[in-house]
């Protein structure tokens, strides 16, 4: 076992459970669409984030170091996608019937977004550059970190989804749901600002 697995896990927990784009969207989706219809988002994050870590460990991090402009472009693409999501969330309808006719974020959108999510990319770069070294232990360390990322990702994103679903019980009228959607949209936009500070 990796001697620093505890510190990696603690860092992963902090990065995964604290508010950020993935969690805000999971909360919103759980609130508006329920657990089952949010499963594609849960699976997309659960598989996408560890896959991002794996890609970085296998060499993507070196490309970012050689060509920092690529990482900047990804950050701006992620920002545009988050603005689009915030718009979509802000103007989603309050009624259950309207939500039945709408679709929550899809698996492939969430999976691809992991490569555009500034919070996730920064956390992944920190994990890979700090804890994974090329050499004899590369495969062992990388495998342990990927397993940890899978466990932490599925746990955090599922928790945020359940929190959203639970919060729906307090939604007694359409106005509340509209305000909730506006608040989630604003939180998503605020999370973008923090990437540029």
What residue ranges belong to the model's regions?
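Juxtamembrane transmembrane-helix termini in multi-pass membrane transport proteins
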Residues: 2-69, 126-145
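Hydrophobic residues within alpha-helical transmembrane segments
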Residues: 10, 39, 43-47, 51, ...
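Hydrophobic/aromatic residues within the transmembrane alpha-helices of Major Facilitator Superfamily
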Residues: 13, 17, 50-51, 87, ...
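Alpha-helical transmembrane segments and their lipid-water interface positions
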Residues: 22, 44, 48-60, 82-85, ...
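Hydrophobic alpha-helical transmembrane segments in multi-pass integral membrane proteins
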Residues: 53-57, 116-128, 186-197
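Flexible cytoplasmic inter-helical loops of multi-pass small-molecule transporters
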Residues: 91-105
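A short amphipathic helical element positioned immediately N-terminal to and/or at the very start
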Residues: 107-115
